[in-house]
C-alpha cells in the first residue's frame, strides 16, 4: 500500500466524518439539540489484515466521537458510533455465503435509529451484526503504582500485575 492510498482512505473515512460533523455542528449548537452517528468498524476497533489504512481511519473516528461527546454535551448534542458487520459489496468476498445470508444490512438499522433518537446515549459504540448488538468500549485496569523512580526493569518485573484485567474501569479523561 502506498502512502497516497493510505491517505485517501483516511481522508474519506476520518476527514469525511469531521467535515460532515463540522457542517452541522453550528446548527445543532444553535438549536441546543443534535445527534451525530459515526460509522466505525470492527476493523478499526480490533484491526484486520490488509486494512491498516481503513482500520486507522475508523478508530480515528472513535477518537473524534470521544471528544465531540464532551464538547457537545452542554448543548444536548450526542455523538455515538456504530460498528456494523453486514453483507455488502465490501464484505461479499470476505465471508462464506451462509454467513452473509445472516448479515443483512437491515439488521444494523435498529441500533442506528436508536443512536440518533431523542433517548440516545452520548459517546457509545454499539456493534451490530446479524441481530446481535453489543457495547464496545475502551477500558482500563487499576494498574500498578511503581512510583516516580520506576525503571524499565521495574515495569518488566511487574508486567503481569500491571496488565491484570481482574478489575476494569472506564473513564473519559486522564485522572491523576
Residue ranges with predicted function:
Residues 1, 47-55, 67, 95:
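Active-site loop-to-helix junction immediately N-terminal to the catalytic Tyr of the SDR YXXXK motif
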Residues 2-18, 33, 37, 61:
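Catalytic Tyr-X3-Lys loop
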Residues 21-22, 66:
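A short, exposed helix-loop element centered on a Lys and neighboring polar residues
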Residues 23-32, 118:
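A short helix-coil junction within the Rossmann-fold of NAD(P)-dependent oxidoreductases
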Residues 41:
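Residue(s) in the substrate-gating loop at a strand-loop-helix junction
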Residues 46, 62, 67-77, 118-120:
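Active-site-adjacent segment of SDR/Rossmann-fold oxidoreductases
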Amino acid at each position: 500500500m502506498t502512502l497516497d492510498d493510505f491517505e485517501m482512505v483516511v481522508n474519506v473515512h476520518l476527514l469525511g466524518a469531521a467535515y460532515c460533523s463540522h457542517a452541522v455542528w453550528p446548527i445543532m449548537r444553535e438549536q441546543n439539540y443534535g445527534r451525530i452517528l459515526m460509522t466505525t468498524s470492527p476493523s478499526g476497533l480490533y484491526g484486520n489484515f490488509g486494512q491498516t489504512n481503513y482500520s486507522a481511519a475508523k478508530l480515528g473516528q472513535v477518537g473524534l466521537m470521544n471528544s465531540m461527546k464532551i464538547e457537545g454535551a452542554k448543548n444536548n448534542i450526542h455523538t455515538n458510533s456504530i460498528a456494523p458487520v453486514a453483507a455488502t459489496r465490501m464484505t461479499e468476498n470476505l465471508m462464506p455465503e451462509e454467513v452473509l445470508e445472516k448479515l443483512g444490512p437491515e439488521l444494523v438499522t435498529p441500533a442506528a435509529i436508536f443512536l440518533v433518537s431523542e433517548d440516545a446515549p452520548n459517546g457509545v459504540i454499539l456493534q451490530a451484526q446479524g441481530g446481535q448488538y453489543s457495547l464496545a468500549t475502551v477500558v482500563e485496569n487499576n494498574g500498578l503504582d511503581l512510583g516516580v523512580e520506576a525503571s524499565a526493569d521495574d515495569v518488566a518485573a511487574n508486567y503481569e500485575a500491571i496488565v491484570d484485567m481482574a478489575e476494569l474501569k472506564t473513564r473519559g479523561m486522564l485522572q491523576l
